[in-house]
Amino acid sequence: MIVRTTAEITDTDRDITSEDGNWRSKRIILGGDKVGFSFHETTIKAGSVNEFHYANHVEAVWLVEGTGKLIDLDNDKVYELGPGSMYLLNGHERHRVEPETEMRMLCVFNPPVTGREVHDENGVYPLVEVPA
């Protein structure tokens, strides 16, 4: 059994802030935990514009707090998000998140991230193998 709190993750190597300071992700479960997925609490700053493309991962996102827009860049669709909204990037969609207020979300990645990934110039996490 694994039990962790965000308080014990804060300000450790599992607490990642983007280079531009727009988002912060607390990586609660990572690939090294060997459970087949990773689980993160992510906050995104109000008024920021954030483009992502998880070409190597499926991501499920549950919005806990905040409001904003999700733009599907592959299909030119705009979705209004609020507490209780969920989106699943099962088609590896390129997308943009534009928070109107600070957003706090819970995210699940498959395959799991290791915690060392950095978004490349296209917003993609590379696929990093988890050591056996």
UniProtKB/Swiss-Prot annotation:
<comment type="similarity">
    <text>Belongs to the ectoine synthase family.</text>
</comment>
<dbReference type="InterPro" id="IPR011051">
    <property type="entry name" value="RmlC_Cupin_sf"/>
</dbReference>
<dbReference type="InterPro" id="IPR010462">
    <property type="entry name" value="Ectoine_synth"/>
</dbReference>
<dbReference type="InterPro" id="IPR014710">
    <property type="entry name" value="RmlC-like_jellyroll"/>
</dbReference>
<keyword id="KW-0456">Lyase</keyword>
<comment type="function">
    <text>Catalyzes the circularization of gamma-N-acetyl-alpha,gamma-diaminobutyric acid (ADABA) to ectoine (1,4,5,6-tetrahydro-2-methyl-4-pyrimidine carboxylic acid), which is an excellent osmoprotectant.</text>
</comment>
<comment type="pathway">
    <text>Amine and polyamine biosynthesis; ectoine biosynthesis; L-ectoine from L-aspartate 4-semialdehyde: step 3/3.</text>
</comment>
<dbReference type="GO" id="GO:0019491">
    <property type="term" value="P:ectoine biosynthetic process"/>
</dbReference>
<dbReference type="Pfam" id="PF06339">
    <property type="entry name" value="Ectoine_synth"/>
</dbReference>
<protein>
    <recommendedName>
        <fullName>L-ectoine synthase</fullName>
        <ecNumber>4.2.1.108</ecNumber>
    </recommendedName>
</protein>
<dbReference type="GO" id="GO:0033990">
    <property type="term" value="F:ectoine synthase activity"/>
</dbReference>
